């Protein structure tokens, strides 16, 4: 069981709502993934109609919604988006995203830390999306973040765990849950992230852009479960030398 703030999750696969070809396909894929937390950008919601085709079905499903501040270019804009989400969605949970560079979507560490402190002081449950920077993740813990979400590789790139060395350090040092976010492109990569000791992974593009998102969602669900089970079972030590599994010379003395 994964616990973030006061909320418990059976599934350690978190998902997103972007890039699906239709709202119905998105909902079916999320159901197939068995995910219990879904992130969505406030800028994508149609708040004027009073009945958004994405929001309403998700609310009715009972899945935990994690509004994100994607599109915010600085701390001020991110705080505004979070406060809007709290008012409209009646939740104090927020995935903090600040990426002023529209080409590579790299998160701004300085603005993110400033916004995180402000939001934590305002009573938000903050899950910041950041570079895989162990020092920054410690600072975010110190200001009160409920979890940290270091990137595996650039958003939507499907490059996998390009930051593995730093993810290991973050996982080792963290006293809050570590959710590996962005860049996970295959179920095997999700398994590996969980084998490292990550508490959860967030996957969107790899599911939504696949030929069969529903089947891919099931694959990721199974992959995350397998990776977590392997981590709990205790992985064997890696050695540069061969280690025999049975005696090599004992039979000569018989």
From Swiss-Prot:
It is found in: Cytoplasm. PANTHER family: THIAZOLE SYNTHASE. GO terms for cellular component: cytoplasm. InterPro entries: Aldolase_TIM, Thiazole_synthase_ThiG, ThiG. Belongs to the ThiG family. Pathway: Cofactor biosynthesis; thiamine diphosphate biosynthesis. Keywords: Cytoplasm, Schiff base, Thiamine biosynthesis, Transferase. GO terms for biological process: thiamine diphosphate biosynthetic process. Its EC number is 2.8.1.10. The gene is thiG. Signal peptide: none annotated. This is Thiazole synthase. It catalyses: [ThiS sulfur-carrier protein]-C-terminal-Gly-aminoethanethioate + 2-iminoacetate + 1-deoxy-D-xylulose 5-phosphate = [ThiS sulfur-carrier protein]-C-terminal Gly-Gly + 2-[(2R,5Z)-2-carboxy-4-methylthiazol-5(2H)-ylidene]ethyl phosphate + 2 H2O + H(+). One of its GO terms (molecular function) is thiazole synthase activity. 1-deoxy-D-xylulose 5-phosphate binds at residues 156, 182-183, 204-205. Homotetramer. Forms heterodimers with either ThiH or ThiS. Catalyzes the rearrangement of 1-deoxy-D-xylulose 5-phosphate (DXP) to produce the thiazole phosphate moiety of thiamine. Sulfur is provided by the thiocarboxylate moiety of the carrier protein ThiS. In vitro, sulfur can be provided by H(2)S. The active site is at residue 95.
